[in-house]
Regions:
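Basic, alpha-helical nucleic-acid-binding regions used in initiation and control of genome expression
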Residues: 1-162
Length: 162
């Protein structure tokens, strides 16, 4: 009912909100496992949100992991304080992205393992999709593509049954 009465923009806004919430939670977990904390400044948060329009959830997760490891190594070697790492971690996710683009590097996709319940529910129950859509950028264009893929799959299944 919800998906039938919502337009694409509303669905994408909600999907991006759930993606953002889940990525922040996972990034905090990555940092906490390395005895670091996350401070979310307005500027860093805005840049992080912009990434959701540029690359996929799984690619952002890869960048978050790289930043967590990098900052953990810096703190362990004494090249950075914990408070500096706390304040700079989120902004550095977008800086790592910028560096990757400038250097023409490919950003790999992280494994989809521990998706938050809210994000998983929204994708599987509201959008009626598989969580593998997280390998694509959350956009209205991709939402239409996912719908068309489902129609094509249903058509192929109908032909196979005949």
């Amino acid at each position: 009912y919800f998906i039938e009465n919502s337009n694409e923009e509303e669905l994408i806004i909600l999907l991006k909100k759930y993606i953002y919430d889940d990525l922040i939670r996972q990034f905090e977990d990555m940092l906490n496992s390395r005895r670091l904390q996350l401070h979310i400044s307005e500027n860093a948060n805005d840049k992080f949100i912009e990434l959701i329009d540029k690359i996929s959830y799984t690619q952002i997760l890869t960048l978050c992991n790289r930043v967590a490891v990098f900052f953990s190594d810096k703190v362990l070697t004494g090249n950075m304080s914990k408070s500096m790492a706390k304040n700079a971690a989120l902004l550095n996710v977008s800086k790592f992205y910028d560096r990757a683009i400038q250097s023409d590097w490919t950003i790999n996709h992280a494994e989809i393992c521990h998706i938050g319940k809210e994000l998983q529910f929204f994708i599987e129950r509201i959008l009626n999709k598989k969580t593998t859509i997280l390998k694509d950028i959350a956009s209205a264009e991709n939402l239409r593509k996912w719908k068309n893929l489902e129609k094509d799959y249903n058509r192929q299944t109908a032909y196979a049954e005949e």
